[in-house]
Every structure is written in C-alpha cells, then in structure tokens.
Amino acid sequence: MFITFEGIDGSGKTTQSKLLANHFKQIRGENNVVLTREPGGTNFAEKVRGVLLTNNIDSISELLLLISMRREHMKKLILPALAEGKIVICDRFIDSTIAYQGYGFGVDLRLIRDLHKLVEIKYPDITFILDIDVKVGLNRAKDKNKYEEMDVNFYNKVRKGFQEIAIKEPVRCSVITGIETKNDNHVHNEIIDKIT
C-alpha cells in the first residue's frame, strides 16, 4: 500500500506521516513500513533538496528537477518496497508538485501531468490532504525555506490546488478539514478511521 500526505506548509503532514508509520509498525513490524519524504527520499534527492529549498530557480527547471528526483525515488525506494509487500508512507508526492508548481507558480498543469506519465510515476493508493487555513499553517510551519517566504496569495492558490485535486480524484484523495481546530491525535484517529 502506498500512502501520501499532502497540504500546505504547516498543515501537519510530517507529524501525521510519522504517526501513521508508527501505527503500522506496531501492527506489521518495524521492517514492513517505509517512511519517506519529498523532495528527498534517496541520497541523490536529499542532496538536490537543499538546492531546491534555498535557491530561486526558474519554475520549469524546478519542475524538471522535482520529476527527476521523483523518478529516482520511485525506482530506488518506493517500487522495491511495494514489491516486497511493505507499506510506503510519503510526506509529499506528485500532488505537491501539481499544487505548488501548477497552481502556485502557474506552470501548465497538462505539462506537469504529461512529464509524470513520461517517466512512469505511480500514483499513490491513498492520499490524505490536510486542509488548514493558510495563515494558521504558515504560523505553524517549522522549516523556513523559500516557500515559506511566499505571500498568502500564493498559498491560497496552492490550497485551492489541493482542494481541486481532491474533487477530481475522490477515490484516491481524502481531505481532512479543520486541521487548525484539532489536535494531532484527533487528526490521526480520523486518518485511521478512513483507512480501516
């Protein structure tokens, strides 16, 4: 099973990814669950991550780097783990690229999808989109990088992107709303209820 967590910065993706991984490790065993992230997940991608998050590069160049990193991530980590019957949980994946690069920066959505098809990216089985008020999310965000320096209008576009993805793909995507009014355990229990 391949599960991803999506949402704007400060929505709690990293926390919920870790909580779900720990939940499955208790059930399936430590070695049967893989927790990973994007950008990142492989040695190559982790090196490029620092460049992406701290440098302002052209939006198409950034898209191509993200897709290259994702292909490497799929081939070296995600697909082998899934082939071994492991549960893979990823903090961000393809939907973040669509929301941030497409909706936020205005890169053509068709181009983003076509490039992912070209490099044979597998979509997750389940995606949890953690929906939070933009201002609250930005106040909660822990990692300060170039994206946190973007204005509220940018994040409103990104949030709208995630919401539209969920509308277009209701079987794969499950939206957890009102994150700003719930504690981490409440959100985690909501996620567990949706999986079982």
Swiss-Prot record:
Q: Give the binding site residues for ATP.
A: G7, I8, D9, G10, S11, G12, K13, T14
Record-linked Gene3D superfamilies = P-loop containing nucleotide triphosphate hydrolases (3.40.50.300)
One GO term of the biological process aspect = dTDP biosynthetic process
Report the domain of life of the source organism: Bacteria
Alphabetized UniProt keyword annotations: ATP-binding, Kinase, Nucleotide biosynthesis, Nucleotide-binding, Transferase
**InterPro entries per record:** P-loop_NTPase (IPR027417), Thymidylate_kin-like_dom (IPR039430), Thymidylate_kin_CS (IPR018095), Thymidylate_kinase (IPR018094)
| This protein's record includes keyword Disulfide bond | no
The catalytic activity, as recorded, is: dTMP + ATP = dTDP + ADP
> Which E.C. number(s) belong to this protein?
2.7.4.9
Task: List cellular component terms (GO).
Answer: cytosol
Q: Which SUPFAM superfamilies match?
A: P-loop containing nucleoside triphosphate hydrolases (SSF52540)
- The yes or no answer to whether the keyword Glycoprotein is present is no
Q: Name one GO molecular function term.
A: ATP binding
A Pfam family = Thymidylate_kin
Name the family the entry cites. Belongs to the thymidylate kinase family.
The record describes the protein's role as: Phosphorylation of dTMP to form dTDP in both de novo and salvage pathways of dTTP synthesis.
Its name, as the record gives it, is Thymidylate kinase
Q: Which organism is it from?
A: Wolbachia pipientis wMel
Q: Which gene encodes it?
A: tmk
